[in-house]
């Protein structure tokens, strides 16, 4: 959802009228658009939990989802369909073929998810966040870099008195990453480090009250968050590139279950090899790094590369969309 919001913001700035943009998402995704003057259609779209087999066995549910979308959007007058993947991507691909609409796909991970993999075999232009993305049709594939909020920046300089760690525990698998932080807080006292912990919707726990620890369910504008932290602890999903782009070092705890584990482990491998991140595969590794920081040991920061090779994809993707609109 966030790449779509960032893309829409850039399209507005380039003169594309809001009335020309419509969003199809689910109930959870629609919450991100509450304060935006844009047409958002919340639709209960079929989601396969068993990969390709699930789509094949539930063909009627997919047809129902397609018909719901066709009722909500005037596809006869639609010039572009854009998807960022997940369960809606195959439907977007089919609709682009059926209604002869220009189709764009954006893949946020180095190992494409099943949705984008299926969608990529429909006629389309594909944009990737990571170089050498696999598990996707390589035809018309362009490594543009990620779509980010271009307002973000990291103005914080590391001082000798306190190190601020931002924890993003609000994504898939948040229970594990949150529990690791709680375990550390239960076993240790925060003196020279401060933790800002995003726990995710409905995960706020009033019992977790510690010195130098702040807990929030959700941060809508990440600009302030990134400007406040020296280091980030998070999963290794596509959104992690945002922190890497502004040279915030990463301690990564990849999600270990289901198909998501593949793309997160590969994302993490790329970021570690590029010296943007270190891997924390268990509690002991995380505790070791935190305790070093408690001693104001800055050697961790010296290990990370400042030679940022990651591109920002916003302008390249927006230009292609506008070129298509102007045809």
Predicted regions and their residues:
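Nucleotide-activated sugar donor-binding and catalytic core shared by glycosyltransferases
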Residues: 1-198, 202-327
């Amino acid at each position: 959802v966030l790449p779509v919001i960032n893309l829409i913001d850039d399209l507005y700035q380039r003169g594309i009228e809001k009335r020309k943009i419509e969003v199809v998402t689910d109930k959870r995704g629609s919450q991100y658009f509450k304060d935006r003057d844009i047409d958002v259609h919340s639709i209960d779209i079929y989601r396969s939990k068993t990969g390709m087999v699930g789509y094949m066995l539930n063909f009627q549910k997919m047809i129902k989802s397609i018909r719901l979308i066709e009722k909500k959007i005037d596809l006869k007058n639609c010039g572009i369909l854009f998807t960022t993947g997940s369960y809606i991507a195959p439907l977007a691909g089919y609709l682009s073929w059926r209604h002869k609409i220009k189709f764009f796909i954006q893949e946020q991970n180095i190992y494409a998810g099943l949705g984008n993999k299926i969608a990529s075999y429909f006629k389309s232009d594909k944009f990737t966040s990571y170089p050498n993305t696999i598990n996707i049709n390589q035809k018309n594939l362009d490594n543009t870099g990620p779509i980010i909020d271009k307002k973000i920046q990291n103005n914080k300089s590391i001082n000798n008195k306190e190190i601020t760690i931002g924890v993003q525990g609000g994504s898939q698998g948040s229970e594990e990453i949150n529990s690791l932080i709680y375990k550390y807080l239960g076993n240790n006292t925060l003196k020279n480090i401060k933790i800002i912990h995003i726990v995710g919707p409905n995960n706020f726990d009033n019992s977790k009250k510690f010195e130098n620890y702040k807990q929030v369910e959700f941060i809508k504008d990440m600009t302030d968050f990134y400007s406040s932290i020296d280091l980030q602890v998070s999963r290794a999903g596509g959104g992690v590139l945002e922190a890497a782009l502004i040279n915030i070092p990463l301690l990564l705890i990849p999600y270990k279950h289901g198909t998501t584990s593949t793309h997160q482990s590969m994302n993490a491998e790329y970021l570690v090899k590029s010296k943007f991140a270190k891997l924390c595969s268990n509690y002991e590794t995380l505790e070791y790094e935190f305790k070093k920081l408690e001693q104001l040991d800055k050697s961790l920061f010296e290990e990370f590369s400042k030679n940022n090779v990651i591109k920002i994809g916003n302008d390249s993707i927006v230009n292609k969309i506008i070129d298509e609109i102007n045809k």
